[in-house]
Amino acid sequence: MIQNSAGYRSLNTASPMTVQVKNQKKICARCNKLVIPDSQRTKTTLKALGKYYHESCFTCQDCQKPLKPKYFPYQVDKTSESILLCQYDYFRRHNLLCHVCDTPLRGLYYTAFGYRYDEEHFSCTICATPCGVKKCFMYGNQLYCKYHFLKYFSKRCKGCEFPISDQYIEFPKGEEIHCWHPECYGIHKYWHVNLAAETVGLQYLPKLEYNPNSGDKDINPTAYELDKQMQAFNFILSKTWSVLYRFEEEAASCISDMFQYLTSNDQLKGIESTGLLVLKIDCLFRGLDTLNLSTNKSMPVNSDQECIENNAMAASKYSKFPKNLSTKIMIYLQLLRKLGTENKNETITISSFMSVITGLAHFLKLLTRFGLYTALENNKLTHSVNPLLRFLREVEKNELFENNPFQYIKTPVNATDSCAGCNKYIQEECIQFYEHRWHIACFTCSSCHKNINPRSLTDPTFNKEKKKILCSHCSIDDPASVPGFKFVTKLAQLIFLLKIALVKSRTVMLKSKASNKVGRNSLQSTMLKEQTYIRTLNDIKRLRSRRESVRVTHNKQQARKSVILETAETDLNDPTKQGDSKNLVIQTDDPSSSQQVSTRENVFSNTKTLTLDDISRIVAAEQARELRPNAFAHFKKLKETDDETSNVVPKKSGVYYSELSTMELSMIRAISLSLLAGKQLISKTDPNYTSLVSMVFSNEKQVTGSFWNRMKIMMSMEPKKPITKTVFGAPLDVLCEKWGVDSDLGVGPVKIRIPIIIDELISSLRQMDMSVEGIFRKNGNIRRLRELTANIDSNPTEAPDFSKENAIQLSALLKKFIRELPQPILSTDLYELWIKAAKIDLEDEKQRVILLIYSLLPTYNRNLLEALLSFLHWTSSFSYIENEMGSKMDIHNLSTVITPNILYLRHKEISNDNVPDEPESGLVDSFAQNKGENYFLAIEIVDYLITHNEEMAMVPKFLMNLLKDVQLQKLDNYESINHFISTVMQSKTIDYSECDIKTPVTVKDSTTTVIQGEINK
């Protein structure tokens, strides 16, 4: 017995280690009551984490279950407090419960899709097959093996209709969301071709509905058959995309270099780039030749006659493109040679060879598409994938040529392009014997004069000394004659002619360079042009990468494998270990592919590569720079020590309308309207003034989604608008919201919302021959136009297959769509302002006013106009090719036929001529109502907009500066903004220098002289 200072005695029942705390009172940490030892020891005192507990109080903090004999200490987050938990709640708080059986994970477990599984339940819900670490799929919060996931639950690709096993792109289109394999989306986007099962020699895999009571025996297909077919398809898909996209990048790089060196007057580098392009085109032509062979020889007797006829029609339609492409290269070489002989006081303008560079990219694009399309059609006819693989194998060889093209071009300088028989030019298929070539018609026996079959060339011989062709019968009498004839296809002959032109041009340029010395000023001018071009190139790459970037989603996920090595479990029956501090220890395998997944979250966002579609944008940007040198003065005059980064003097804002928020766009409209009012171009007494003011902030309704705004609309007593069920004739805002798509057809870095029909039409037309005469002028087949219209109206979210139509038909359909819009794209409310702008004499002031009016356009109108103007500018580059070829539709002619569809007034809207009894439909006869004057002024406006489409898409710098000032003043309504702008205009502090014209630049083409927006006939 031990007596304490208070005179109380207690029984020493503690261990020797606890004798020192005998005199302390024991308070229960749970109920805060005194712990009194029971003399009969029916109740024990428990100690954990340095605290005492009644036995009845020693329970789990979460579920109140008794913890004796084992407990788990758990430290509360962001505190130093530790609580006692049972095993289940301890693992629950650590998120270590199996997602399937809801039991604590002990030992090995797996993490996938944000859930954890024990080893037993990390398996397929249907067949219980263990899910591999790299092969786990989830649907409806349940795991499945690859076989059952692909068979029953996987999304289907919009392009190929195969199940999506891993990566896919979600692409909103109208009210639907389409899923694509990234490669299928790329192939469709760049060449408008889909890889269906029948086009790659595989069977279609239908999506089955899972029924647990069906007793499915895992057949049709079996797991092995499905896996084998998916592997085959993925190989074909990956091969097709990688080879053709790589070819497009390489070809685009060559054409870009050709453009750069032509503008910077560098002949030798230009000829090197051209030689490299010809070698790559040679690979494409060889691939096309394999398709012709497979078409002629490999088709089975029972082939689908319709498919054969379609192939023949496609071959006929595309037959002229190789010659057009080679002609463009010949013209380029002619321009390049001209640089050495051109008068030093004269320069070759970009507009003079715009069609050459744009045409090169376009015809090469068309031939690539034709090759892919034909290969897939041949696959369908032969029920195999061999035609496609042969085509890709030849095209892939272009990657062997990286530089120094003339080490691969062995054509001698004295090579001839004439027939050895008639001495006439050979541009078609022919017969070759070493350096000699003959037309097919000239390939006759020199002895018996019989025609020799060009397809059987093993028997005929050639006498080199006498230069005689001998047939198989006559060659017996001439032992000196030897065989060796080869059949040369039309495509191979075109390449041969290009190589002759390359070698001869290079020889002339080398001699010219040896005799001419380049001056210091010429070198500086070349450096300046190269730096300017590189800046344009980088801008185009950056804009395209941002505009086309698409986020990738994953079906499959690599599971993370983990093992629990230690927990904080404590046993009350083992007092020797109660003082040990134990923590939760988990060992986790780091998945090797986690970095790879993160780097592929966005596709089509590479800023280091070019595509053929970028070429036309580069040409347009450089032409705009040539037309407006002051507005695009990015560099000061070069000094010897200057570098690129120190010379940038931006005259443009660099901000595109598509990048602005809705509120910023509304403020821009308010600023522009105030500036126009300040210039007295519009006043409060004008009939359109009220509608223009209301239009300034009108677009806020489109994006404002607060509860009270929605309630205000719902409670409105105004009658609801009729539900639009058709595309043609529907309001533009309704089309964009209901059947719109975020398109990359704009100029800026951000996708723009336009109707699906416009996106499909323009994308399809970019894959067609735009040099056909009368594009946008002819009306096409009226009956077919009505059929297409009815088809589109009946299914607005899915455009028909436009690849079966011709360019004339689609251009007429596009014109019909924009003509039938209830309001013209350039807005009825702005019509008078456009006409007033055209009447302004001073070019500087006219440009400023046009920029202001353009900024007033409603968002969807401007989006559609941006895509349309860019496309029309590109279309104009095919107006003239050579020898009276081409569409004849230059910018002026395009403006003439497009203007009545986008800038006009209807009967009801013409002042002093309201006739209530007449129908509102139909356009005004401009000559009768407006004496013809406004008609030509409207054409001049549209001509200007097409010519300067790149500039129009960008917010003027003076407007951006005023926008910043308005935002600093926190002005948010038209009245306050108008007052502020009036004050600024009175102070005359607005910088309009980007619109100044110091030196007019004249750009001449076949029919039109454009002088800074002025058209001289």
From Swiss-Prot:
Protein name (database record): Rho-GTPase-activating protein LRG1
Cellular localisation: Cytoplasm; Bud; Bud neck
GO molecular function, one term: metal ion binding
Misc. remarks from the entry: Present with 468 molecules/cell in log phase SD medium.
Gene3D superfamilies listed in its UniProt record: Cysteine Rich Protein, Rho GTPase activation protein
Protein's organism: Saccharomyces cerevisiae (strain ATCC 204508 / S288c)
Domain (Rho-GAP): residue spans on this chain: 730-953
CDD domains: LIM, LIM1_Lrg1p_like, LIM3_Lrg1p_like, RhoGAP_fLRG1
Residues carrying the site annotation Arginine finger: R777
Record region (Disordered): 570-602
Domain LIM zinc-binding: 28-88, 98-148, 155-184, 419-474
Pfam families hit by this protein: LIM, RhoGAP
A GO biological-process term: regulation of cell wall (1->3)-beta-D-glucan biosynthetic process
